[in-house]
Amino acid sequence: MKTLIARHKAGEHIGICSVCSAHPLVIEAALAFDRNSTRKVLIEATSNQVNQFGGYTGMTPADFREFVFTIADKVGFARERIILGGDHLGPNCWQQENADAAMEKSVELVKEYVRAGFSKIHLDASMSCAGDPIPLAPETVAERAAVLCFAAESVATDCQREQLSYVIGTEVPVPGGEASAIQSVHITHVEDAANTLRTHQKAFIARGLTEALTRVIAIVVQPGVEFDHSNIIHYQPQEAQPLAQWIENTRMVYEAHSTDYQTRTAYWELVRDHFAILKVGPALTFALREAIFALAQIEQELIAPENRSGCLAVIEEVMLDEPQYWKKYYRTGFNDSLLDIRYSLSDRIRYYWPHSRIKNSVETMMVNLEGVDIPLGMISQYLPKQFERIQSGELSAIPHQLIMDKIYDVLRAYRYGCAE
């Protein structure tokens, strides 16, 4: 990460796409997409997804590292070209506990990430815990971030410390996505970004972390990009110019969250304006969902009724029976809920792919379609971009490759924006 940031600060148009997903097909796609390039791939896990207690994936940081490395070995992607990152590392998962208990868990969380070889660490202690004022004072946020940084430094080996980099600050909304419709978004004021940096510098120095400050490579701000279930707020470069100019006088770049669904031109403009780390998650699993839904429609027409997977019906049944991952985000009417379950840009379906019933139905569908020749006309109907690539000889009409290429479409836009 440090080399890439140095190149950007030296005036080169270069950025990196941060892949925030634990889905094996998304990780496979991210690695396969850059297999034949010289670029490194940044893959990040969030604190609620992967932590010392397993998170919602059931994986510890060490488990996630091995999970990613196993996929890399399968794809033929060199492990040393993977940068592992930890996102929103702090009390996010334990906000219902008092600050002392939540920070104790957060300290162990950060230590486990660093021990497992994660080298990009987002120190985010911005969340109020039980009994805390809302919002927290910037000084409190910075002091807690310094505690987390001290924890990281305390377990890092000399070799790890050379690679270790920190990201500070946070965006609005909190991690997890918008829970309601958005019409506009608050762009971070330069004064607030400067205050975030100033308070963190003061807190780090007070804890004897002066050297660690040199490892702070980025600050998270809101550049004016966001999405909810059916709306996308697109980047307006002119609105972010004060931020773009301010960061030029620092050693850092910006990290932009929720950049999903922006245009490829917007990604290029974001990187030009020093938002050099672009995080993406739901857009990748949304593309995966689109591909699976398209293949399910093809299966419906090609496979005998008694042999069909019933994939779409299974997904719907499971999500309606177990609504905990979408209930507080989606609309309440039955028809509206179904539309959001299927098509929301926030893609809460991503939490359900590991469910045994859904996983088995998708596997059945894939086996069914691997056993037949899919007519080109059907691919044109349901996956038109992939049809064009089949026609030009770039792609084969194999279900797995069709899914990969659908995810590549998202990665292609980021590659354009981050181009070396």
Curated annotation (Swiss-Prot):
Any Pfam family matching the protein: GatZ_KbaZ-like
Signals that turn on the gene: Constitutively expressed.
A GO biological-process term: D-tagatose 6-phosphate catabolic process
Keywords carried by this UniProt record: Galactitol metabolism
GO CC list: catalytic complex; plasma membrane
Metabolic or biological pathway, per its Swiss-Prot or TrEMBL entry: Carbohydrate metabolism; D-tagatose 6-phosphate degradation; D-glyceraldehyde 3-phosphate and glycerone phosphate from D-tagatose 6-phosphate: step 2/2
Entry GO MF terms: enzyme activator activity
Function: Component of the tagatose-1,6-bisphosphate aldolase GatYZ that is required for full activity and stability of the Y subunit. Could have a chaperone-like function for the proper and stable folding of GatY. When expressed alone, GatZ does not show any aldolase activity. Is involved in the catabolism of galactitol.
NCBIfam families: agaZ_gatZ, PRK15052.1
Family matches, as PANTHER family: D-TAGATOSE-1,6-BISPHOSPHATE ALDOLASE SUBUNIT GATZ (PTHR32502:SF12), N-ACETYLGALACTOSAMINE PERMEASE II COMPONENT-RELATED (PTHR32502)
Subunit structure: Forms a complex with GatY.
Family: Belongs to the GatZ/KbaZ family. GatZ subfamily.
HAMAP family assigned to the protein according to its UniProt record, in alphabetical order: Tagatose_aldol_GatZ
The protein's name in its UniProt record: D-tagatose-1,6-bisphosphate aldolase subunit GatZ
